[in-house]
């Protein structure tokens, strides 16, 4: 007989066979199989357990499993190397206790060893067995009242689940296969037991090592921390009393998904907190979002601490306590999509944020893409202009040179979660993350449930209905299309629109749901300061303030009254906010616009606009902050002014281009031309290191290579044709417009912008060339070119309309009389006509000059010269 050794009883295979742990030294623990000497208990068998097999095992389990005990080996079977001996504590001997309860019997081959210390032990065992036999205990009594155990899985798992779902069932953990899968004996009644396989709900553990025990099986290595997770559960649950909650069937349809509750708590939470498992996303339907969220919180802490399977994870947690990242209140200024917003903080700073863990209808998805505008409109109506509470969840790093963006939880004042509201309505999907992802919404599982409910309820883009908005037309695409839409847009006096974009203080891009179209709109009767079109330009004073006020309308509902449309397809009229507030008056009252009447403006509105502007001037607000009212001039000064004769302005010029509409561009001969020649030479050297611009926009100052002479010129982009990769560029030193490929356009360095554009735009005074529709149009342009191009001319400025001068052109070699001017020569040659009186308002009328021109015109008419050859062609004047 060996000495007693202190050990820990790990597992009771039966009433008399155990797995024990013996500590060999400070670090090494040996596990071995050990059986009680001299006795045997009823056996568990595949074909059916012997009576009282469970009772014997349960008796031993309750007494010694999980507890320290003294173990002494009495003998060893040579063939199996199994040790047999005694297990005892300070209170009892296990074999003797089993015999006394009738749960074991002496082995037939066991005999007394007279004269040895074992003899007295054997005698005590015999006495214990005699006691059980005398009182007919256990196996010595009737066997009709024993436990019946069903070892096979339930024949109908779904029916079994339905019968026991929601109940708390007592049981014992029999075996542990992986960290997240156990075999449990359920106590359906005191004498009716059922063995089932339970997968832990809410957690997925790495696979442990598996050793094949038959040819049909395949051994496998553990996943990282797989054996550690299994051992974690073994030490806490193996042959322990637990409470089981069945929740659902496992995917295999045979085993069950459930909670395994130890007196210390749910084992799943302990696995997650130790980093030995990850949250199983697909268990949300069984557990519900509240439980899943609590599990994710536990998992997140393990990730941050890099425990277990998260040891090597790359975790980037934002400093939520940082001042710039704290929760803040803001107003929604723009809804870009159902997952991206722009909000304005209380300090006026606007920032772009994304709603955590959701995605708007994807353009690449054929089923989702048609609902993009409908989804955005749903959210816009709910939150635009409203105050919200923003909480940072995580920061998503920027990609493709884009900045990082804050992913946040946004709540309305009543506590409504915006992301949850959108997903419930079927206008966004929930992002599926990788299992090692830390960054996700704190209500991620609620979002998953909401998405599932929206799909089942056929809401939003899951409805299968036709999208509310499709095939939207751009009514301002061209002048022709805008005029086609004018009557339909004017049919409703106040047309309901949505302000899609703000171009300037008085210019907007609107969307009309009723007419299913977009269009450009400008406030009639006012002008606002011009904003800078690019970084190289400088806006007019108070342009930003005017634009800022106009942006308060962005994505808000408004009403517009359409009055007319201009030649660029922009509709003109009045815009009203809050149904009755004219926005033009608001701009005028704050000194951010000035009056500019129009022909059809009513006297009432004209007076109202001017009175509002006058009040702003008097209050010195906005652009009128330094306004000084004009003083009344003395009578003598007025008289002198009346008698003063205006000196005519003469310019030495050279024509640089003749446009198709009869206007022409000229350069003033002087220092400007000399500076331009130097600049053109420098541009030629810049061509050697030419690099096309990556981004080309309308209004951009550029250096462009002309296709006519392959030279480089300064210019301004007028129109971009993205489809053909070309742009219409005004070469503003010469006045010509060319279509130039993007590959021949580069940004213009600031050093080349100091010299102002050298070309001036002009038209001939008193006369007009035939229109492009005339058969004589090309002939007239050719004659004009022969008379004026490549010659030093003198231009007498007669007036101007905007930036277009009205001039009389003289060729010094022809003479200085008016009858010798190019204007008169064109009329005499029948290549131009005297303009009607209604078109002479932009320059001073010279009666003598007009008489000369009319004489030339009458002579050409009578002699059938030029376009008078077949009679009177002047019907085009009307």
Curated annotation (Swiss-Prot):
Positions in coiled-coil regions: none
Limits of the Tudor domain: 695-755
CDD domains: SNc
InterPro entries (UniProt xref): Silence_cplx_Nase-comp_TudorSN, SNase_OB-fold_sf, Staphylococal_nuclease_OB-fold, Tudor
Subcellular localization: Cytoplasm, Cytosol
UniProt keyword terms in alphabetical order: Cytoplasm, Phosphoprotein, Repeat
Domain of life the protein comes from: Eukaryota
Alphabetical list of PANTHER family matching this protein: EBNA2 BINDING PROTEIN P100, STAPHYLOCOCCAL NUCLEASE DOMAIN-CONTAINING PROTEIN 1
Gene3D superfamilies referenced in this protein's UniProt entry, alphabetically: 2.30.30.140, 2.40.50.90
GO biological process: mRNA catabolic process; regulatory ncRNA-mediated gene silencing
A GO CC annotation given for this chain: nucleus
Boundaries of every TNase-like domain copy: 3-142, 167-312, 326-464, 493-626
Species assigned in the record: Schizosaccharomyces pombe (strain 972 / ATCC 24843) (Fission yeast)
GO MF annotation: an example: nuclease activity
Phosphoserine found at: 316
Protein name listed in UniProt: Staphylococcal nuclease domain-containing protein 1
């Amino acid at each position: 007989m060996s000495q007693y050794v202190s050990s820990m009883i790990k597992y009771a295979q039966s009433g008399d066979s155990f797995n024990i742990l013996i500590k060999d030294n400070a670090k090494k623990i040996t596990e071995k199989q050990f059986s009680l000497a001299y006795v045997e208990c009823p056996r568990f068998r595949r074909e059916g357990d012997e009576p009282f097999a469970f009772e014997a095992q349960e008796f031993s389990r309750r007494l010694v499993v999980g507890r320290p005990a003294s173990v002494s080996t009495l003998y060893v079977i040579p063939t199996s190397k199994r040790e047999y001996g005694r297990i005892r504590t300070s209170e009892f001997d296990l074999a003797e206790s089993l015999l006394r309860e009738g749960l074991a019997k002496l082995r037939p081959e066991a005999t007394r060893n007279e004269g040895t210390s074992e003899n007295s032990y054997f005698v005590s065992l015999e006495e214990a067995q005699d006691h059980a036999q005398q009182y007919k205990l256990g196996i010595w009594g009737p066997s009709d009242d024993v436990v019946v155990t069903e070892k096979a899985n339930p024949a109908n798992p779904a029916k079994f689940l339905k019968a026991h779902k929601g109940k708390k069932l007592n049981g014992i953990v029999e075996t542990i296969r992986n960290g997240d899968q156990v075999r449990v004996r359920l106590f359906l009644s005191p004498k009716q037991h059922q063995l089932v396989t339970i997968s832990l709900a809410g957690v997925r553990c790495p696979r442990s090592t598996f050793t094949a025990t038959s040819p049909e099986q395949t051994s496998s290595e553990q996943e990282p921390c797989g054996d550690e997770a299994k051992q974690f559960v073994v030490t806490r649950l193996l042959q322990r009393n637990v409470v089981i909650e069945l929740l659902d069937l496992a995917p295999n349809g045979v085993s069950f998904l459930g909670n395994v509750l130890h007196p210390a708590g749910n084992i799943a939470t302990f696995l997650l907190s130790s980093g030995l498992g990850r949250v199983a996303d697909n268990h949300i339907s069984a557990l519900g979002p509240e439980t899943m969220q609590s599990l994710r919180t536990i998992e997140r802490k393990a990730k941050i601490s890099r425990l277990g399977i998260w040891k090597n994870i790359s975790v980037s947690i934002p400093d939520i306590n940082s001042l710039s990242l704290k929760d803040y209140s803001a107003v929604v200024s723009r809804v870009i999509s159902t997952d991206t917003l722009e909000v304005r903080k209380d300090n006026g700073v606007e920032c772009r944020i994304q709603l955590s863990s959701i995605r708007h209808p994807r353009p690449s998805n054929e089923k989702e893409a048609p609902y993009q505008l409908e989804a955005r409109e749903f959210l816009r109506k709910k939150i635009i202009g409203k105050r919200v509470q923003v909480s940072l969840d995580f920061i998503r790093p920027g990609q493709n040179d884009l900045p990082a963006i804050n992913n946040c939880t946004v709540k309305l004042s009543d506590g409504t979660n915006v992301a949850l509201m959108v997903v419930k309505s079927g206008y966004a999907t929930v992002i599926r993350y990788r299992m090692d992802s830390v960054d996700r919404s704190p209500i991620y599982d609620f979002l998953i449930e909401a998405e599932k409910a929206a799909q089942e309820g056929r809401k939003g883009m899951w409805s299968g209905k036709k999208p509310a908005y499709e095939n939207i037309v751009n009514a301002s695409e061209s002048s022709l299309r805008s005029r086609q839409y004018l009557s339909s847009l004017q049919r409703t006096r106040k047309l309901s629109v949505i302000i899609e974009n703000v171009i300037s203080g008085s210019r907007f891009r609107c969307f009309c749901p009723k007419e299913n179209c977009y269009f450009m709109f400008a406030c009639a009767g006012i002008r606002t300061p011009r904003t800078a079109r690019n970084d190289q330009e400088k806006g007019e004073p108070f342009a930003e303030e005017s634009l800022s006020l106009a942006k308060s309308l962005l994505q808000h509902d408004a009403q517009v009254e359409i009055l007319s449309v201009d030649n660029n397809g922009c509709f003109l009229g009045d815009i009203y906010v809050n149904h009755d507030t004219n926005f033009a008056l608001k701009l005028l009252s704050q000194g951010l616009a000035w009056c500019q009447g129009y022909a059809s403006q009513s006297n009432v509105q004209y007076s109202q606009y001017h009175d509002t502007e006058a009040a702003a001037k008097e209050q010195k607000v906005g652009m009128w902050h330094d306004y000084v009212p004009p003083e009344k001039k003395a009578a003598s000064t007025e008289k002198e002014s009346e008698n003063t004769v205006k000196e005519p302005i003469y310019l030495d010029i050279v024509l640089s281009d003749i446009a198709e509409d009869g206007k022409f561009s000229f350069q003033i001969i002087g220092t400007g031309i000399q500076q331009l020649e130097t600049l053109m030479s420098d541009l030629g050297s810049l061509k050697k290191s030419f690099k096309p611009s990556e981004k080309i926009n309308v209004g951009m100052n550029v250096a462009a290579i002309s296709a006519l002479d392959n030279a480089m010129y300064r210019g301004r982009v007028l129109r971009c044709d993205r489809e053909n990769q070309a742009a219409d560029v005004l070469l503003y030193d010469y006045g010509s417009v060319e279509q130039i490929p993007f590959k021949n356009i580069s940004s213009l360095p600031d050093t080349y912008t100091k010299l102002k554009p050298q070309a001036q735009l002009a038209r001939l005074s008193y006369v007009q060339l035939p229109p492009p529709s005339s058969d004589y149009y090309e002939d007239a342009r050719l004659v004009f070119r022969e008379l004026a191009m490549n010659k030093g001319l003198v231009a007498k400025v007669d007036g101007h309309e905007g930036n277009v001068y009205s001039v009389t052109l003289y060729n010094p070699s022809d003479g200085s009389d008016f009858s010798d001017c190019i204007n008169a020569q064109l009329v005499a040659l029948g290549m131009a006509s005297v303009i009607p009186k209604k078109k002479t308002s932009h320059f001073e009328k010279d009666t003598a000059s007009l008489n000369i021109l009319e004489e030339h015109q009458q002579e050409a008419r009578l002699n059938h010269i030029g376009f008078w050859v077949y009679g009177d062609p002047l019907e085009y004047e009307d």
